């Protein structure tokens, strides 16, 4: 009996782009042989809005509302790096109380970001229940944000030299109540998820990244710490007042999707510890360095000249960036968020280069999915934790 020779061509599957509220406008062109992935090519740029060029035509305060649109699930971090860069460039000191307020807000934002990673990630691997649980806790964090800043998501709260407003009356007690409520909920998540045999089969050994490989690819955040590298910029760069608080770097050595899940679960616990300590030792005093608003220049006499006498509204003085360059970075929920800033003694930056963690971490995706099954693509992509707003900028 003669067998018919069949020719097998690889199949090309286009995954995405999805809506920004789902997995984001990332398109993957996947080449597969049946269920096995041969190649994967990410197509970026669907959410590119020219954020770096916008910065060059705005003052820092004018630019602050724009930066919350990079990583729109952890907006406190994009605001923090936007004011940290000019502060470091001009050597502006911030009050101790403002630094503690920043730490509390940043760690709340870190928890909210990890929660909204956990829910969709679990839905991707087939567990729907945690998706509904995480929104319950995340809503409480957003209530705290709304009480302190007036906005649930795009806060516009950080300022050069401090923060916009102090905590309202009773906010500290509400935040402590949330911490006491949230810690048992993290234990509940772990009981529900970590030892689940179906979950373990979907994530254990999937998307493995070795220690040297993670360093060579320039990975950061939970992606790096899950591969056995104890690297956290809060410990390395000693910014704000993190050194005055007792907390540990969360890391794992396995390097797979399960390790990245465990790192983020551990980080939520550590963030609660940081918030509880900061709320108990937060000092009094001003919440903003008002001296940062002053200008080191003489009174400009040309405004009194004949040519300007009919101008009804003269431009108000604003913060000028010194003629220097500087790179500033912070530990965002997804990794190292950095700004390379060049000032030229003007109110607007000459160059504003954004180093987003998601963009760098995403580059390793094609290598991770080669040789895996099609169903593993969503598991690996979910474990990287990307937001296309900061990837495309």
Curated annotation (Swiss-Prot):
One biological process term in Gene Ontology: photosynthesis, light reaction
| PROSITE patterns reported for this sequence | COMPLEX1_49K
* InterPro entries, A to Z: NADH_Q_OxRdtase_suD (IPR001135), NADH_UbQ_OxRdtase_49kDa_CS (IPR014029), NDH1_su_D/H (IPR022885), NiFe-Hase_large (IPR029014)
Q: What's the chief localization of this chain?
A: plastid
Tell whether Translocase is among the UniProt keywords.
Answer: yes
Q: Which chemical reaction does it catalyze?
A: a plastoquinone + NADH + (n+1) H(+)(in) = a plastoquinol + NAD(+) + n H(+)(out); a plastoquinone + NADPH + (n+1) H(+)(in) = a plastoquinol + NADP(+) + n H(+)(out)
Concerning Gene3D superfamilies, the annotation shows: Cytochrome-c3 Hydrogenase, chain B
Topology in the lipid bilayer is annotated as: Peripheral membrane protein
Kindly state one GO CC term assigned in the UniProt record: chloroplast thylakoid membrane
What does the similarity note say? Belongs to the complex I 49 kDa subunit family.
Give a short account of what the protein does.
NDH shuttles electrons from NAD(P)H:plastoquinone, via FMN and iron-sulfur (Fe-S) centers, to quinones in the photosynthetic chain and possibly in a chloroplast respiratory chain. The immediate electron acceptor for the enzyme in this species is believed to be plastoquinone. Couples the redox reaction to proton translocation, and thus conserves the redox energy in a proton gradient.
Partners and quaternary state? NDH is composed of at least 16 different subunits, 5 of which are encoded in the nucleus.
Entry protein name: NAD(P)H-quinone oxidoreductase subunit H, chloroplastic
Q: Which organism is it from?
A: Angiopteris evecta (Mule's foot fern)
């Amino acid at each position: 009996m003669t067998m018919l020779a069949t020719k097998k061509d690889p199949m090309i599957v286009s995954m995405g782009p999805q809506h920004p509220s789902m997995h984001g406008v990332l398109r993957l062109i996947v080449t597969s042989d049946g269920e096995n992935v041969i190649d994967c090519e990410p197509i970026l740029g669907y959410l590119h809005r020219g954020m770096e060029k916008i910065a060059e035509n705005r003052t820092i305060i004018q630019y602050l509302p724009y930066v919350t649109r990079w990583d729109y699930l952890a907006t406190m971090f994009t605001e923090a790096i936007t004011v940290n860069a000019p502060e470091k460039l001009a050597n502006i000191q911030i009050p101790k109380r403002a630094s503690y307020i920043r730490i509390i807000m940043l760690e709340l934002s870190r928890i909210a970001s990890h929660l909204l990673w956990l829910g969709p990630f679990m839905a991707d691997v087939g567990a729907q229940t945690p998706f509904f649980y995480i929104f319950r806790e995340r809503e409480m964090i957003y209530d705290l944000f709304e009480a302190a800043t007036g906005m649930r998501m795009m806060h516009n709260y950080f300022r050069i030299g401090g923060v916009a407003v102090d905590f309202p009356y009773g906010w500290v007690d509400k935040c402590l109540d949330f911490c006491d409520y949230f810690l048992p909920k993290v234990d509940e998540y772990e009981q529900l998820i970590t030892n689940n045999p179906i979950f373990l089969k979907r994530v254990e050994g999937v998307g493995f990244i070795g220690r040297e490989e993670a360093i060579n690819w320039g990975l950061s955040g939970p992606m790096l710490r899950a591969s056995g590298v104890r690297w956290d910029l809060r410990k390395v760069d000693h910014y704000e007042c993190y050194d005055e608080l007792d907390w540990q770097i969360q890391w794992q050595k396995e390097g797979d999707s399960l390790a990245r899940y465990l790192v983020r679960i551990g980080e939520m616990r550590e963030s609660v510890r940081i918030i509880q300590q900061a709320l108990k030792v937060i000092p009094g005093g001003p919440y903003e360095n008002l001296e940062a608003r002053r200008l080191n220049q003489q009174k400009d006499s040309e405004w009194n000249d004949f040519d300007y006498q009919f101008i009804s509204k003269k431009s108000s003085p604003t913060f000028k960036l010194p003629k220097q360059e500087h790179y500033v970075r912070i530990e965002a929920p997804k990794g190292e968020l950095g700004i390379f800033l060049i000032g030229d003694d003007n109110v607007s930056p000459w160059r504003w280069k954004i180093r987003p963690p998601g963009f760098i971490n995403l580059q390793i995706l094609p290598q991770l999915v080669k040789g895996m099954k099609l169903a593993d693509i969503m598991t690996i992509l979910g474990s990287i934790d990307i937001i296309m707003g900061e990837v495309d900028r």
